[in-house]
Amino acid sequence: MKRVTIQDIADALGVSRNTVSKAINNSDGLAEATREKILQKAVEMGYKQFSYVAALSGSGRFVPTGDSEPPAAASEIAVFTANLSLLSNHFAIPMLDRFKQELSQLGYSFNIYKVDRENLAQHTLPATFDPERASAIMCIEMFDRAYDEMVCTLGLPVLFVDGPHKRYGDSLPADQLLMDNTTGITKLVHDLLGKGIRKIGFIGDYEHCQSFFERYVAFRSAMTLAGVPVDEAFCIKQHSADMDVPLSALPELPEVFLCANDFIAVDTMQALRKLGKSVPGDILLCGFDDAPESRIMTPALTTVHIHTQIMAFTALHLLLSRMKEPYLDYRTVYTATELICRDSTKLTVKEEVK
């Protein structure tokens, strides 16, 4: 079966690709009737995870189709996060907005709890969180493995959106939701190698979380399988606002830096400018997440887009089904992502390596 794309949906409805993308990602600036029409068409055509995670009613809302039961007295879905500040600029915000909308339609309340340093150190719960009121917990930006293991012992359904890295193969006893961290990076590396580029580096702490780890592994695997050695000098694990320090310590710069997310890419671009280097003139740059900043910066940043609305529906499905069937085997689910090539990796014909 042919894979359904955003363009296919746009063609079927006679609207622009950008309009369809806004509807699928729950972006602002779109009439609700138009959004509902597009989402219904996406389900009808079998677009990506929509056919798996939900059916939509005439109102464009999530229909649990047997996955959930009416809320009990404990009807709160709690969200734990160790980094509220990052959530303000993170892909999780549009995902959580949609998630909250759908939960309210099903009769559940929704609250976000900050897990502070003291909680992490002492393995205690946030002061205002009452386990007796909670039906389930969703953890976002929760990368302390020991604390996460404690959360898994509370006797509640737990879903991790991303999570601590599994470098050593140690998984948590809970469901996990991730974005596809491999396909976009693999494709970009393949395309760059096809243009004769060989010096490719990576910036980001691959032990920060599972997503960073998978993006790093995707980069190394793509290089290795193509028979191109990875220059370890071009792999910078450290990330800080002063990226000019590790960059200036390099004997030479690579031709491309792949960054673990867009914010690292933004800091890297600023540091390169301080060193008198331009993107893409002197070096190409790629991020991950498709944060709003990636579209408005100059040059616009090549990145990997996360479909936040699909992640919201998938998270809802995973939590509701776990609440109904607590003894299901633990699941790790990936939602599709999309490589977005912009000016930061743009080569002119003259610049392409022969």
Predicted regions and their residues:
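Alpha-helical recognition/docking segments in bacterial nutrient-uptake
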Residues: 1, 65-190, 246-252, 263
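Short, solvent-exposed amphipathic alpha-helices that sit
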Residues: 90-105, 184-187, 210-229, 267, ...
